[in-house]
């Protein structure tokens, strides 16, 4: 009789490698390992071999890099979605896609369950499982680290588990940072970062970005072309999404841009400190905001600023496949219809500065904005505007004076006595 199948989100790391024999021993399932390439830069042939040697019945490697950029990163970019002012959502944007692909393989294989190796303290367990619930509410989810049958409390126990069974151990016992990498970012947690008073050891930590102080002093100029809010060209050359982001990561990395050290609020209730390398992403966000400044009117831009916070929160919390997220993105897509043009930035020792922008949809009109007098704007027009714009303040002051409290209220407003000489 054929065994039931479980689809495992397999990264090739220690946790998910241990989970393969653990699932077979504790659930008697055939394990279907699914590796999803979102730009980790891993040796997928070696990882597939490891999964099969460790006991997986099958292992599939999915190149999802293009899909990840175009369907997850670009929407977040168009929305200017930044979590808690700094985090560009590198891990958060990848998890909904991974969850969706896991469901697709579960359906294809006729699996009864999906398993992941996310810890019980992190955000990823939430993100994976919300995606699974959105597409396959009938499927069982096995979260190994929360399972009653899981009796390993750390790396040493996991290594011992594999060694006892004569299986390959995909890492050494020495300490290292806990990292998550994809085409958009690289995150670092653990070691000295677990104490907030410690400065990050950037020289030891960084992989894709130079320490800003060691970046070239002359800096570098970059021009990004946008069509409806989506990056389509770099320095005058049309490029596909993967090539463009790959090249921008190199350019940003050698100029030390996109480093973030943040103590963020996890959706599970605790704070967590991490250092993020997002060199290409930082450039794109800066350039895209330049385009929004140029092409969006005041009311739309200000409302989008508020909405961006909510979109970032939804992405961070794993609520990508929700009605609210779809509704927010419908607004974002409307705002981006005219965000077409180019933005030029200068990168220098970790800093990004604007160096010009242009668009046929630009709402900047030099003849109006110029300090010289022109036909389109009469300085005297401001008089009526100021009268009406300031009317609420004037009416309130008149009321205060009429009720006999005017002088007391005026004196309470912390006015200073100024010198008269």
Each language-model region and where it sits:
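Nucleotide-activated chemistry modules centered on ATP-dependent adenylation/adenylyltransferase
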Residues: 2-9, 14-421
């Amino acid at each position: 009789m054929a065994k039931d199948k479980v689809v495992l989100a397999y990264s090739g790391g220690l946790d998910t490698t241990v989970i393969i024999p653990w699932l077979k021993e504790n659930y008697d399932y055939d394990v279907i390992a699914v590796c999803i390439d979102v730009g980790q830069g891993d040796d997928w042939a070696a990882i597939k071999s490891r999964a099969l040697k460790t006991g997986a019945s099958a292992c599939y490697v999915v190149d999802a890099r293009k899909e990840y950029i175009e369907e997850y990163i670009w929407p977040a970019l168009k929305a200017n979605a930044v979590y808690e002012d700094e985090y560009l959502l590198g891990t958060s944007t990848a998890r909904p896609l991974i969850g969706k692909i896991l469901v697709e393989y579960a359906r294809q294989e006729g699996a009864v369950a999906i398993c992941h190796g996310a810890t019980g303290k992190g955000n990823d367990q939430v993100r994976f499982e919300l995606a699974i619930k959105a597409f396959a509410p009938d499927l069982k989810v096995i979260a190994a680290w929360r399972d009653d049958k899981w009796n390993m409390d750390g790396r040493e126990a996991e290594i011992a588990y594999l060694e006892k069974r004569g299986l390959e151990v995909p890492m050494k016992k020495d300490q290292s940072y806990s990292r998550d990498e994809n085409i958009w970012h690289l995150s670092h947690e653990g070691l000295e970062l677990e104490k907030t008073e410690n400065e990050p050891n950037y020289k030891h930590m960084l992989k894709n970005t130079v320490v800003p102080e060691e970046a070239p002093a002359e800096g570098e100029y970059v021009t990004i072309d946008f069509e409806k809010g989506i990056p389509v060209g770099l320095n005058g050359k049309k490029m596909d999404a993967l090539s463009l982001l790959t090249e921008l990561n190199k350019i940003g990395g050698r100029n030390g841009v996109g480093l973030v050290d943040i103590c963020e609020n996890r959706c599970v209730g605790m704070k967590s400190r991490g250092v993020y390398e997002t060199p290409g992403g930082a450039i794109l966000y800066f350039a895209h905001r330049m385009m929004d400044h140029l092409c969006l009117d005041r009311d739309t831009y200000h409302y989008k600023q508020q909405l961006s916070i909510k979109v970032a929160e939804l992405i961070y919390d794993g609520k990508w496949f929700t009605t609210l997220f779809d509704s927010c993105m419908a607004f974002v897509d409307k705002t981006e219809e005219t965000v077409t043009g180019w933005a030029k930035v200068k990168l220098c020792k970790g800093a990004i500065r604007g160096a010009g922008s242009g668009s046929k949809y630009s709402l900047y009109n030099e003849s109006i904005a110029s300090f010289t007098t022109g036909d389109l704007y009469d300085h005297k027009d401001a008089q009526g505007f100021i009268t009406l714009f300031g009317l609420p303040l004037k009416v309130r002051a008149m009321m205060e004076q009429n009720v006999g409290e005017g002088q007391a209220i005026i004196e309470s407003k912390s006015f200073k006595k100024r010198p008269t000489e």
